[in-house]
């Protein structure tokens, strides 16, 4: 797999609170230069990214209910609607982990379905925060996502105690079948990215996209 092929797996990511407008401009410039699939940014920066990426194939991905997932479902849906109005092409929502831990699976499904409806056809990725879940909980969450026919299930926010693992990616892929799997959190080098792809990931969320395609390790990156 060459650099251009790997680049098309990557959501080039900048989600930490201290990112400036100049950081977002740089992120967009890098995405254009290296032909990444998308930039993944907080929704306040969608208009800026839309301006910078106009006329390019790079998509805009944003996050909803991020990073905890404990917002009201109606709030997540409102975030989604406003993000799409602003120019978002893809939505990454955080599942309600507390509801999973409370065995409130109907509420989990309704939460995802509410956001999916607000997506109005735009691809929805559901972040499971796998480091907080048991294997059985990962499978159950993936089964719900498969039933709802979301576009992707995603491992992690990158803001918790663990990120993507090959084992979790493989488990998710076995469970969801044709639905996409996005590996995110701790994917900082070429070897790890390729391992995730081989395990079943069809998208990689990373702030170290340039290091990944150049075969270099960015040890300062956390997402």
Swiss-Prot record:
Pathway: Carbohydrate degradation; 2-deoxy-D-ribose 1-phosphate degradation; D-glyceraldehyde 3-phosphate and acetaldehyde from 2-deoxy-alpha-D-ribose 1-phosphate: step 2/2. The keyword Coiled coil does not apply. Gene3D superfamilies: Aldolase class I. This is Deoxyribose-phosphate aldolase. The active site is at residues 92, 154, 182. It is found in: Cytoplasm. It comes from Pasteurella multocida (strain Pm70). Keywords: Cytoplasm, Lyase, Schiff base. One of its GO terms (biological process) is 2-deoxyribose 1-phosphate catabolic process. It catalyses: 2-deoxy-D-ribose 5-phosphate = D-glyceraldehyde 3-phosphate + acetaldehyde. Coiled coil: none annotated. It is an enzyme of class 4 (lyase). SMART domains: DeoC. Its EC number is 4.1.2.4. GO terms for molecular function: deoxyribose-phosphate aldolase activity. It holds the Pfam family DeoC. Catalyzes a reversible aldol reaction between acetaldehyde and D-glyceraldehyde 3-phosphate to generate 2-deoxy-D-ribose 5-phosphate. Belongs to the DeoC/FbaB aldolase family. DeoC type 1 subfamily. The gene is deoC. The keyword Cytoplasm applies. GO terms for cellular component: cytoplasm.
